[in-house]
Regions:
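Solvent-exposed interaction patches of small proteins and small membrane subunits
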Residues: 1-154
């Protein structure tokens, strides 16, 4: 069976996001194995910084690519006209269609990402709290991606 260009774009976007989803999980396992806590976070060694940088990069890429590539590609494959939709409208439409559990939760995940990547508090405990929030958000992103995977394979 031949795929439409929209279906091919959707498959490409899904594969891209899946590639980003694996790397944060790997770095998170390594971070947990190292036992990085608030005290250690204030004085990270070179290897720990690399792990956190890898996590931060892949986490932000996953969030960005899901929002800018996978979600629009999903809507296009469903026959929706995304050109006239704002990002918030796309999230709301995906929620209506049952592809996204909550547009508001997605917005919260975006806010966590923005705080993690753009705000640099001086206090190490605040930075560590933002890392913890990003770790939890990464797990939620993986769950959202799994929801999209199940819908795409239907």
């Amino acid at each position: 069976m031949n795929q439409t260009p929209e279906q091919m774009a959707l498959q490409h976007s899904l594969a891209l996001c899946q590639g980003h989803a694996d790397a944060p999980q790997d770095s998170l396992q390594d971070i947990k194995a190292r036992g990085i806590g608030v005290d250690e976070y204030a004085n990270l060694g070179k290897e720990d910084r690399r792990l956190l940088d890898q996590f931060a990069y892949r986490y932000t890429r996953l969030q960005d690519d899901m929002g800018t590539k996978l979600m629009p590609a999903s809507l296009k494959a469903l026959g929706e006209n995304v050109a006239a939709m704002s990002a918030l409208d796309r999230f709301a439409r995906l929620e209506q269609l049952g592809w996204l559990a909550s547009a508001d939760e997605w917005q919260t995940l975006r806010q966590i990402r923005n705080q993690f990547t753009h705000d640099y508090p001086n206090n190490p405990s605040e930075r560590f709290e933002r890392l913890q929030a990003a770790v939890n958000a990464a797990a939620q992103l993986t769950a959202v991606l799994a929801q999209f995977q199940s819908k795409i394979k239907m």
